[in-house]
C-alpha cells in the first residue's frame, strides 16, 4: 500500500540500509578488519547528509517543513553476534560527523548556579531575527551520564521569565542533572515554543547534547509553566519518542494539538490550578485527564505487559494560575525511556505545518494522506503488526468568546493507496 513503513527487527542475518531521521537508525559492517574503512564511509555519509539538511533547511522554511528523509545504498551483511559492535561503530561515526559539522555548538555546561549565558542564531528562513539565549548548566555531580531537563518559561516579559527559569531550575530537587533553559527569541506572535524555528532548536539540542556524551539518552525530560505548559504539552506528544517523561504545568491544550496516544511509553505529569479559568486551562486539563484515563482503560499494557499510559494529572484545589511548581521534576526523574517499545501508538500530525519523518523505529517512506494518520504497531514473537488508519476530527465544543475548539470526536478509516 502507499502508506509504507520501514521497521527494524532482530533476526540472525539481515541487511539494513543506513538511514537518518532526527538522530540515527542504522547498523552496518561485518568484518573487524574493514571496520575503520566502513566507519569512515558511514561518517562521510552522515556529514554530507547533515550539510545537505543544513543548506536546504536554513534557506527555506518549506524545506524544513517537508522534513525530507535521506537514505543511502551502504549495505553489509552482518551476523547477530556482531550487532553491538556495529551499532557502536555507526554511533561513533555519527558523533564524528556532528563534531566536524560547521555550526554553532552547544556550550559546555558549567555549574547552573553561575548562570552562564550562551545563544544560538535560529535560521532566518524559519523566523526573522531569532536569537535564542540559553542557560546550559549542571546541578550536582555523579559518575556517568546525567539526565537532561528542558524547561520552557511563561509568556511574561521574556528577560524576566528567563531569569525566573534559572531560579527555579536551581531550586528544583532533581539533581544531579543537566538543565537547558532557553529564552523565547521573539515575543508577540512568535511567543510559541512549538513553532518551526523552535523545532529546529529542540532537534539541534537533542542531537548535540547526545553527541557530547555527558547526557543519558534515555533520561530526557521536557516541562514548562503557563506558555511553557502549552509548549511542553505539545512537544510531549510531537517528540514523545525522545522523552522519558513530560510535565506541563498551568497550561491546557485542546487535544487536537497534542494527541495523548503518542504519549504511550512515557511518563506524563500535568498540574493545573483547579481555579485557573484563564483560556479554560482548568477545563482543558480536565479533558486531558479524561483522555489519558480512557487510553489507559483501553490499552492498560503494552506487548511486554508493562503499563502503557503512566500519568499523573491533577487539578490542584484552591489554586489559580500560580501553583506548586516543585512537584513536577522529582516525579519526572523516576522515568527512564524505553527506546525499543514493542507497542507504538502514533498519530502523525503536523505542528506548525511540519510532520515528523518517523517515530521510534517507524519511518514513513510515503504517507497515504496529507492529513493525519494513525499507526498502531505491536511486536510479538518477532512478528510486527501495523494497522494504519486515516484520522478525521470533528469539533463538538467551541468556546463562544474566542472560538477555541475545546473537544473533538475522532473518526478512523483504513488507509488506502
Language model segments and positions:
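Primarily recognizes the serine-hydrolase "nucleophile elbow" in alpha/beta-hydrolase
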Residues: 218-264
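Bacterial N-terminal signal peptides that target proteins for export
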Residues: 3-18
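Bacterial N-terminal signal peptides
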Residues: 17-26
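The feature captures the conserved acid-bearing segment of alpha/beta-hydrolase catalytic domains
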Residues: 245-333
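Gly/Ser-rich "nucleophile elbow"/oxyanion-hole loop immediately N-terminal to the catalytic nucleophile
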Residues: 139-144, 190-226, 240
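Alpha/beta-hydrolase-fold serine-hydrolase catalytic core, especially in secreted/extracellular enzymes
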Residues: 35-73, 293-417
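Short substrate-entry loop that stabilizes the transition state in hydrolases
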Residues: 141-191
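A domain-start/cap signature at the N-terminus of enzymes
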Residues: 34-146
Amino acid at each position: 500500500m502507499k502508506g509504507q513503513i520501514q521497521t527494524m527487527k532482530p533476526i540472525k542475518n539481515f541487511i539494513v540500509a543506513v538511514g537518518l531521521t532526527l538522530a540515527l537508525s542504522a547498523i552496518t559492517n561485518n568484518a573487524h578488519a574493514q571496520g575503520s574503512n566502513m566507519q569512515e564511509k558511514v561518517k562521510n555519509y552522515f556529514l554530507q547528509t547533515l550539510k545537505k539538511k543544513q543548506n536546504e533547511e536554513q534557506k527555506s522554511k518549506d524545506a524544513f517543513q517537508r522534513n525530507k528523509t535521506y537514505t543511502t545504498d551502504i549495505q553489509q551483511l552482518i551476523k547477530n553476534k556482531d550487532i553491538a559492535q556495529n551499532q557502536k561503530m555507526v554511533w561513533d561515526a555519527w558523533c564524528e560527523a556532528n563534531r566536524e559539522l560547521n555550526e554553532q555548538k552547544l556550550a559546555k555546561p558549567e555549574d547552573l548556579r553561575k548562570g552562564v549565558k550562551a545563544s544560538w542564531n535560529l535560521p532566518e528562513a524559519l523566523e526573522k531575527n531569532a536569537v535564542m539565549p540559553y542557560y546550559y548548566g549542571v546541578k550536582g555531580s555523579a559518575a556517568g551520564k546525567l539526565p537532561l531537563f528542558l524547561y520552557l518559561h511563561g509568556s511574561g516579559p521574556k528577560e524576566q521569565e528567563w531569569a525566573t527559569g534559572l531560579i527555579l531550575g536551581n531550586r528544583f530537587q532533581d539533581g544531579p542533572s543537566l538543565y537547558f533553559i532557553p529564552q523565547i527569541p521573539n515575543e508577540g506572535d512568535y511567543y510559541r515554543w512549538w513553532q518551526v524555528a523552535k523545532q529546529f532548536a529542540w532537534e539541534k539540542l537533542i542531537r548535540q547534547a547526545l553527541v557530547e556524551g555527558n547526557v543519558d539518552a534515555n533520561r530526557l525530560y521536557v516541562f514548562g509553566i503557563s506558555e511553557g505548559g502549552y509548549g511542553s504539552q505539545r512537544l510531549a506528544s510531537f517528540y514523545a519518542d525522545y522523552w522519558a517523561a513530560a510535565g506541563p504545568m498551568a497550561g491546557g491544550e485542546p487535544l487536537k494539538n497534542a494527541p495523548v496516544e503518542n504519549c504511550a511509553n512515557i511518563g506524563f505529569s500535568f498540574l493545573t490550578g483547579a481555579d485557573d479559568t484563564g483560556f479554560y486551562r482548568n477545563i482543558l486539563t480536565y479533558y486531558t485527564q479524561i483522555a489519558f484515563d480512557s487510553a489507559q482503560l483501553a490499552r492498560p499494557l503494552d506487548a511486554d505487559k508493562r503499563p502503557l499510559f503512566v500519568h499523573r494529572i491533577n487539578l490542584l484545589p484552591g489554586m489559580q494560575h500560580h501553583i506548586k511548581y516543585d512537584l513536577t521534576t522529582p516525579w519526572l526523574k523516576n522515568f527512564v525511556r524505553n527506546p525499543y517499545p514493542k507497542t507504538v501508538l502514533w498519530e502523525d500530525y503536523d505542528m506548525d505545518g511540519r510532520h515528523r519523518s518517523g517515530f521510534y523505529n517507524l519511518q514513513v517512506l510515503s504517507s497515504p494522506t496529507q492529513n493525519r494518520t494513525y499507526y498502531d504497531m505491536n511486536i510479538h514473537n518477532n512478528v510486527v503488526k501495523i494497522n494504519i488508519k486515516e484520522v478525521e476530527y470533528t469539533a463538538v465544543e467551541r468556546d463562544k468568546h474566542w472560538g477555541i475548539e475545546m473537544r473533538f470526536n475522532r473518526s478512523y478509516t483504513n488507509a488506502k493507496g
